Amino acid sequence: MAGAARDRAFLDHFGGAGADRPCHVEGALMNDMSRQATRLDAIGGRYDPWLLGAAVTLASLGVVMVASSSIELEASPFYYLTRHLLFLGGGIALAFWAMRTELKTIEQHNQMLLLACFVLLVVVFVPGLGSTVNGAKRWINLGVSRFQVVESVKVFYIIWLASYLVRFRDEVNATWQAMLKPVFVVGLLVGLLLLQPDFGSSMLLLSVTACMLVLGGAPIGRIILPILLLLPALVALVIFEPYRMRRVTSFMDPWVDQLGSGYQLSNALMAIGRGQWTGVGLGASVQKLNYLPESHTDFIFSVIAEELGFVGVCGVIGLYALLVGRAFWLGMRCVEMKRHFSGYIAFGIGLWIAMQSFVSIGVNLGILPTKGLTLPLISSGGSSVLMTCLAMGVLLRVSYEADRAERLRSKLSPQGAAISPGEPAEPVVDAVPPAYAPARKPQRDTAAAPAPAAAPVAAHVAPASAILRGTSRMQPRVEPTFGRIA
């Protein structure tokens, strides 16, 4: 209504609408709106500096700790460091690509990304393509290296689920059928993961799905019921699989079988204990000298604790808290701006990083059973490094587009005043100087002929709400339950 009132005032300024408006005035109007559209297109955004700083600091710390923890594992002291740097370079390239790609383009391919999840999880079982390590079929053999497919699945699935919640957020809030569709999809993905087997990543995907459904509008009560139904099956998977049961028993008391099932955890705890307050010094770890298995991947946190001490551990946890906190803040900001796809992606990536880092640190501290989950951005591992960097690039793109929309909102609002997030701005047409306004014709005192209907002005110009909402649907929709949670 406000936009229509401004348009009518603008037309009155030019001497009426339709036949009463001269051609040169209409041309001036079109030229002015064209210039305004050009100015709006030139508006850019900026990437979140806190998010970027936390990611770069964690990745830099990862380079140092991979070099320190793997120096005695191969004949060449920098074998794993060189590989890590190569994969990190590839990850940075993927991150730059994601930072330069519009989110609407990514959303348009959400179905293809979901299909890629299933294809990747099936390919590992194809003879000649899949690679088996320690009895697990989790990798694709690329010749020069192996690629762990679940790392791609995490990113692709979060993007698909974010798109689904945008397209069906009313239905997810109101019906069982819409809520159970992503549950069915993640159930199929988890089934394929358990065949590899990969119990840790399965639980991670289930947890991220449950949290994103709640944030997307599903009632918490409806989420709890499927969880209660799945819980006995998950417990049975642990009890009836001997190696999983050994992990649980060794986690409860690793010192009972210190040289057997509790070997990894007991050495990890000894490394953490040696670190004390300030650590033994960078590069001076003893446990990494072929005592602690996987010291450069799953148990790199123990080496950090030994070399940098309690102070270094607090710094690492603080960096993860900053990264995840900024992701959640960004998600909340996007949802308030009606940019739901961007917001759900930010929430999903933040949940993934938070849960995986918590599990990895918890395993090293002995508060959780051993899982094969790396420490994001720090641990060595080509697949993890590549896909985590890609996720960071997508997250930074979310921050860029949110900032750009905020600047656009300021430009469109009168006198630069901010418009509330719940009221999308309408385009404001700059007034043409009065020198161009022709004199009005005197009106006759006749009540016969009604005024001609006003011709539509610049119908091809998209409303600002379409730009500010990003890739969300344009029609009014019920807001998700996240507003009630917040």
Curated annotation (Swiss-Prot):
A Pfam family it matches: FTSW_RODA_SPOVE
GO BP terms in the entry: cell wall organization; FtsZ-dependent cytokinesis; peptidoglycan biosynthetic process; regulation of cell shape
Pathway(s) annotated for this protein in UniProt: Cell wall biogenesis; peptidoglycan biosynthesis
Catalytic activity: [GlcNAc-(1->4)-Mur2Ac(oyl-L-Ala-gamma-D-Glu-L-Lys-D-Ala-D-Ala)](n)-di-trans,octa-cis-undecaprenyl diphosphate + beta-D-GlcNAc-(1->4)-Mur2Ac(oyl-L-Ala-gamma-D-Glu-L-Lys-D-Ala-D-Ala)-di-trans,octa-cis-undecaprenyl diphosphate = [GlcNAc-(1->4)-Mur2Ac(oyl-L-Ala-gamma-D-Glu-L-Lys-D-Ala-D-Ala)](n+1)-di-trans,octa-cis-undecaprenyl diphosphate + di-trans,octa-cis-undecaprenyl diphosphate + H(+)
GO CC annotation: cell division site; plasma membrane
InterPro entries for the chain: FtsW, FtsW/RodA
Gene Ontology terms for molecular function: lipid-linked peptidoglycan transporter activity; peptidoglycan glycosyltransferase activity
Subcellular location as annotated: Cell inner membrane
Topology in the lipid bilayer: Multi-pass membrane protein
Record field: transmembrane: 51-71, 78-98, 113-133, 142-162, 175-195, 200-220, 223-243, 299-319, 343-363, 375-395
Periplasmic domain ranges by topology: 72-77, 134-141, 196-199, 244-298, 364-374
UniProt EC number: 2.4.99.28
Principal cellular location given in the protein's record: membrane
Keyword set, alphabetical order: Cell cycle, Cell division, Cell inner membrane, Cell membrane, Cell shape, Cell wall biogenesis/degradation, Glycosyltransferase, Membrane, Peptidoglycan synthesis, Transferase, Transmembrane, Transmembrane helix
Keyword Cell inner membrane: yes
This protein's record includes keyword Transferase: yes
Cytoplasmic side: 1-50, 99-112, 163-174, 221-222, 320-342, 396-486
Family recorded in the similarity comment: Belongs to the SEDS family. FtsW subfamily.
Function: Peptidoglycan polymerase that is essential for cell division.
Protein name as annotated: Probable peptidoglycan glycosyltransferase FtsW
Organism expressing this protein natively: Xanthomonas oryzae pv. oryzae (strain KACC10331 / KXO85)
Gene: ftsW
